[in-house]
Amino acid sequence: MWDYTDKVLELFYDPKNQGVIEDNGEPGVKVATGEVGSIACGDALRLHIKVEVESDKIVDSRFQTFGCTSAIASSSALTEMIKGLTLDEALKVSNKDIADYLGGLPEAKMHCSVMGQEALEAAIYNYRGIPLATHDDEDEGALVCTCFGVSENKVRRIVIENDLTSAEQVTNYIKAGGGCGSCLAKIDDIIKDVKENKAATNLNNKGGSKPTNIPNSGQKRPLTNVQKIALIQKVLDEEVRPVLIADGGDVELYDVDGDIVKVVLQGACGSCSSSTATLKIAIESRLRDRINPSLVVEAV
């Protein structure tokens, strides 16, 4: 049995705002609906919003859902959260916000909060008269999961927004990979690519903000081995290690043999599937840029 919070159970047994908002032609307001999921896949959500046209605020919201305890609770929570928000404010509500409002969801049920976020977005764009295909480029990417019709762009977005690290987590959030399983290797590749890009971005944003001051005599004399080791250690300490430590990892200089720099990856870096990217992007490229373009970094 799933371990649900008291808030989840409360909104499951006594859901708030369940039902339909009828468009009765009330002056000054407009009703819109967003739908996601499908009954065939086991989860479907229809979200209704009533918007005050002049202020662009959501004055009422209700839902209809076909799904489990988490689906009902997530939908009910969302309708409570968005009342009184402008449409632009509501668009900022994430699936994490929905889960936090509920005090957390079992990871295998996180896709219910994702459905809520997507239904809200669909309702708002329907209200604004913008076809979903126009604003949502996720379906333009290559199809990764044929069982649930999930594109590469959607997998990539959900990995980035929720900091996911495994294909199993992706399945829990958007069901991709939960059918025949043939796409799990592709999902792993996407996660790896996201990690590599994140490592490069973190290094540029953090490590590159204050370059190490490398003394320059103006003469192109080769560095002695002692000088080279000292400079490598300086760059590692000042530019590389702070970035890795912030992500739960670290690096230690082990040896320098000519242009071969041997290091020991520690903490999260040592067990991370993207350790090769860490070596090449976060360490080797920085040492080449700061000291010598012929340096090669190897892990021991």
UniProtKB/Swiss-Prot annotation:
Region of interest (Disordered), residue spans: 201-220
Annotated positions binding [2Fe-2S] cluster: C145, C147, C180, C183
GO MF term set: 2 iron, 2 sulfur cluster binding; iron ion binding
Membrane-spanning ranges: none
Gene3D superfamilies: 3.90.1010.10, BFD-like [2Fe-2S]-binding domain, Fe-S cluster assembly (FSCA)
CDD domains registered for this protein in UniProt: IscU_like, NifU_Fer2_BFD-like
Cofactor(s) essential for the protein: [2Fe-2S] cluster
BP terms from Gene Ontology: iron-sulfur cluster assembly; nitrogen fixation
Cofactor-binding details, from the entry: Binds 1 [2Fe-2S] cluster per subunit.
InterPro entries (alphabetical): BFD-like_2Fe2S-bd_dom, BFD-like_2Fe2S-bd_dom_sf, FSCA_dom_sf, N_fixation_NifU, NIF_FeS_clus_asmbl_NifU, NIF_FeS_clus_asmbl_NifU_C, NIF_FeS_clus_asmbl_NifU_N
Keywords (A to Z) from UniProt: 2Fe-2S, Iron, Iron-sulfur, Metal-binding, Nitrogen fixation
Function: May be involved in the formation or repair of [Fe-S] clusters present in iron-sulfur proteins.
Assigned protein family: Belongs to the NifU family.
NCBIfam families the UniProt entry points to: NifU_proper
Protein name: Nitrogen fixation protein NifU
Organism: Trichormus azollae
Lineage: Bacteria, Bacillati, Cyanobacteriota, Cyanophyceae, Nostocales
